[in-house]
Amino acid sequence: MPVLPELAQIQFKGFSRFVHQKLLKELENFPKIEDTDKEVEFRSIGNQYQLTEPSLEERDAAYQCITYSADLYVPAQLICKEDQIVQEEDVRLGSIPWMNSGGTFIINGIARVLVSQILRSPGIYYNRESDQRGILAYTSTVISDQGGRFKLEIDGRNRIWVRISKKKKISIFILLVAMGLCKRDILQNSRYPRIFSNMFKRQKESIESPEDAIVELYKHLYSATDADVFFSESIFRELQKRFFQHRCELGRIGRRNLNIKLTLDVPETESFLLPQDILAAADHLVEISYGEGKLDDIDHLKNRRVRSVADLLQEQLKLALNRLENLIRQNLSRAVRRKRAITPRGLVTPVPVIAAFKEFFGSHPLSQFLDQTNPLSEMVHKRRLSSVGPGGLTRRTASFQARDIHFSHYGRICPIETSEGMNAGLISSLAIQAGVNTSGSLGSPYLEMSDSSGEEQLVNLSPAEDDYYRVASENLLLSEWRGSEKEIIPVRYQQEFLSVLWEQVDFRSIHPLHHFSIGASLIPFIEHNDANRALMGSTMQRQAVPLIKPERCIVGTGLESQVALDSGSVAISEQDGKVCYIDGNRIELSLIHEAKKNKLAQPTTIEELKIFERSNNNTCMHQKPAVSLGELLRGGEIVADGAATVRGELALGKNILVAYMPWEGYNFEDAVLISERLIYEDIFTSLHIEKHEVEICATNQGPERVTKQISQLDGYLLRHLDDDGLVELGSWVEAGDVLVGKLTPQEGASSSRVPEGRLLQAIFGIQLVNARESCLRVPIGGRGRVIDVRWVYPEDDATNDLEVIHIYILQRRKIQVGDKIAGRHGNKGIVSKIVPRQDMPYLQNGTPVDMILSPLGVPSRMNVGQIFECLLGLAGEFLETHYRVVPFDERYEREASRKLVFAELHEAGARTNNPWLFEPSHPGKSRLIDGRTGDPFGQSITTGKAYIMKLIHQVDDKIHARSSGPYALVTQQPLKGKSRRGGQRIGEMEVWALEGFGVSYTLQEMLTTKSDHIQARYKALSAIMTGKPVCKPKTVPESFRLLVRELRCMGLNLERNFISEEDLGREFENI
């Protein structure tokens, strides 16, 4: 397996480019600021900026729930023009959130990640579209750097229009004149003057000057009335802002693309659209309409660019500096007008910069909550590409072509891993070798085939260059075919797959996983799976929870170690040294080379370990030492494993003995049977940490108090509180127990009515105040062990009146009925029954099966890779061998995977004296014995070791029940949702289920009495508790009353009358 680049490099390189290039560019563009009288001038020296080290460590910032940031200082000068006095000092512009060692940002103690956005690159694109009448027309779309766009289109009479929207278009002649050209310049510089001369003749408006064109352009685009509009500076500024700046600013990348497309020679520093650009675009549009030239493929990656961390942060810094500029201008003018002494520090405040970044990280769609379910989910989240967001596509309007796989995605964007649902095709993932260059283009490395020297050189090809070369597919055996010059090789060339001679190959892929993402690259035998199931497998790997006893997979692909290393979940020794101290919190290394230089003291380095830290997804992040005392280490070696790593390799699940067979119908439709051994031996036991918080603030009646003395509650609920009113560490708490005792003062409305209250108020003017309890309790299903109690003071609280208490509770969850489990091939299921181990089927050597899967879930879903994995895992279990199988091994020979599996099974049976492992009559199957009867089953059954993961979709988080609870105010029906302690909605399918069992009276009570009858439901509850029969209500339920009220609102009066049977019969006869 070749060495892969760092998987999180897109984040690190983007932030480095922001700090060293983008930040300097924006600071240098900060303008000089003068007061209204131009007596005093403020200027900043942006090229001498300084960024200080963050004041806190990453772990301390997360612990104290503050932002991990660095302060930005810039030298500033204040020049008094009259006296020529210059004041210069360093001013603090604000704080910039700093990227940590994991490639994420700590914002208010929470890990967040900036997702890269892929959108259309600025420039010009030619296409053929149909108008509202279905007539095809050639168009050219100009896309600005800010995402604004307009179109040039040519109709059947060779007239060229500028279209701003579906309903608004103007003649190109008006736009050109508004940009400063006259008729003579247009005719002289155009390659098709006859078309423009015909347009001039048909022009109805009389336009002689740019002012007339600006007025006409404004009237056509933005005027809401038909009144006369005259040229003015306000109209010019509004048009400049709403049209030219938003739709005509190309930027450096857009200018480069425009020059290449239209063969122009305009400097890249000219970022705005020029009149000659419009003329050249119109000329090329005419050529396209005559059949000369090619149309653009807008979905090609050469027409896309990636907005990485650098671009997103630069945009926010630009916005913040604009706000700071306005604020400095106001402060300077006010100080000069009032003749106050001013200094540069007195004019600059860090609030605009801090507020802009806080708003960006808190509300921007591309600033997302980091998925920390396991190390793989973190890494995949950092490498995600989003087509939605500001300036991009939308979920509802994105076309199928924009979502589909494109041939230019090869080696750059994974064709498998994407979101499901409305985001399908819009949220994608980078291929493992892909990278982003400085211009935002996605590149992919290839090996260049040299004819003379025979050496292969690594070359990074952009999507635009990829079309001009013959690229061989992912075949590592190409190097062995050099002697056969006449060998036919399959290659990609100009959007097609061809077969050419060896000597005609220009580049080849690096390895078979070249075009897959990380998640898909971790699936062994992925070539034997359907793409939909491979997608589900890569998705569910990100949902696996770390187990308390992680285990390496027997069958892997070889990328497990690099994913674990680059995710940051393992601890690495920075230098060579010897382990001199180990405990659960830290590891100390004595530096060998430094010790030789310094004879007086032996320098050491300390590696602090993560101990039961909560992740964003409530999973447990924990590190365990992986070295022993006195062990010699080299720099870069692993000293501690993470919660989901073993020996430096990713370990998301367990190797479980499975059997593919039906079992009494309990594994019907993706249901799964498990052995009770998985529970008793903590095979699938995981740790989860829940955070509960309560605010302590000052009210109008006084400050809230944290205390244990709460008379309103029973002492049993307060048993875990210490003298300060906080729960003690290590306490085991149940649902309803008090975690923080808190009293909130309130005005005693009832005490003021008693004689004592009125007397005290009349004599002393004292208003009696009582307090209500507002304690923090353990919610339903939140029992566990208290592992941490924190007092947090929010950094944005200027008055220091707000305090927040965080309580962390550790839960140990065993696998149970209702939990979701899955393999790596999209084979998922829900635990339906836990079977005693003596009743489970067992192998011929007496080993009971741990899990029973349905065999019907394999052929219809076409994920045969799980069969290869479980059989090879069985051989590896007996041979005590771990396999790392590179996908697409069919390049060696046909049926290579099947031959490998059967060969290893045969060897395992022969070496361990278990011939039943490989039966020639039924290869891959063996006889199982029924644990209940002791008799063998009638047919051979596929058994093996499969790598099974426990997913975060657990029944403890989903199941909910209530006997009574809150009701809606209008309908008087139970609320919806677990968080509101809601009830079960008896819908259509639930009614069918109850009807199937014939419980008609129970169904009637659920739909009427127990649902929304205010009086009858309390009587029913009392009758059930006392064992008496439930009485039928004499009045109608509340929902019927609501229906009557709604009908009355519509003018329909519904009355209820009692009619005898005879009268009812007469009424029907009259009808």
From Swiss-Prot:
Keywords: Chloroplast, DNA-directed RNA polymerase, Nucleotidyltransferase, Plastid, Transcription, Transferase
UniProt cross-references to PROSITE patterns, sorted A to Z: RNA_POL_BETA (PS01166)
Pfam families for the chain: RNA_pol_Rpb2_2, RNA_pol_Rpb2_3, RNA_pol_Rpb2_6, RNA_pol_Rpb2_7
Gene Ontology annotations of biological process type: DNA-templated transcription
EC number assigned by the record: 2.7.7.6
GO cellular component, one term: mitochondrion
Major subcellular site: plastid
Catalytic reactions on record: RNA(n) + a ribonucleoside 5'-triphosphate = RNA(n+1) + diphosphate
Localisation per UniProt entry: Plastid, Chloroplast
UniProt superkingdom: Eukaryota
Disulfide linkage: none
Stated role: DNA-dependent RNA polymerase catalyzes the transcription of DNA into RNA using the four ribonucleoside triphosphates as substrates.
Record PANTHER family: DNA-DIRECTED RNA POLYMERASE I SUBUNIT 2
Entries under NCBIfam families matching the protein: PRK00405.1
Name under which the protein is recorded: DNA-directed RNA polymerase subunit beta
